[in-house]
Amino acid sequence: MPILKPKLEVPLSSPNLPVPIMFRSAVAPAEGIYPLHQHAWGEFVYSFSGVMEVKVADHHYLAPPQYGVWLPPQLQHVGLNRYEAHHCSLYVGPQLCSALPATPCAVTVSPLVRALLEHLRQQPPGQDATPQHTRLLQVLLDQLVTAPRAGSYLPTSDDPLLGTVL
């Protein structure tokens, strides 16, 4: 009997973001999957614990806590994880994406970026409308623009023999 994987709801289905930069955090259960989707905005995916996986066409990106994954606007992707993962997404309006990569990539997460993401995760609901919150999101975006790129971070394979080695 096949094991059913929990399908996670794609967080935003609206064609537009309510604000230019938006932060969202969640806990994804083991074997969770965000089905194939795309949005009009860019997305930076980060995992506080566990490893988030992002599949884009025939590329597979892994995001352990040292890395995040940048996804430019209008890119179809699937998000998944093998074990429970505490993760977040930074949604970036298309008007702010020009300084970020035009293709998906793994991004090195500096201690400052990690601290900003952790701070945002700890904020109570309703803080996202304040000028201070907006400035903090802009600083985070500025840091991501200059962060080193890391390709896909780790090699992966669907081959059963290679999969055990990798």
Q: Model-predicted segments: where are they?
A:
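A short beta-strand-loop-beta hairpin characteristic of the jelly-roll/cupin
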Residues: 45-64
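Short, Lys/Arg-enriched, Trp-marked, Pro/Gly-tolerant hinge/linker segments that flank
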Residues: 124-166
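Double-stranded beta-helix
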Residues: 95-119
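Short acidic-glycine-tyrosine-enriched beta hairpin
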Residues: 28, 58-73
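Generic protein-terminus/edge-of-domain signal
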Residues: 1-51
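A generic beta-sheet turn/junction motif
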Residues: 40, 56-58, 83
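Ligand-binding loop in jelly-roll beta-barrel domains
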Residues: 74-104
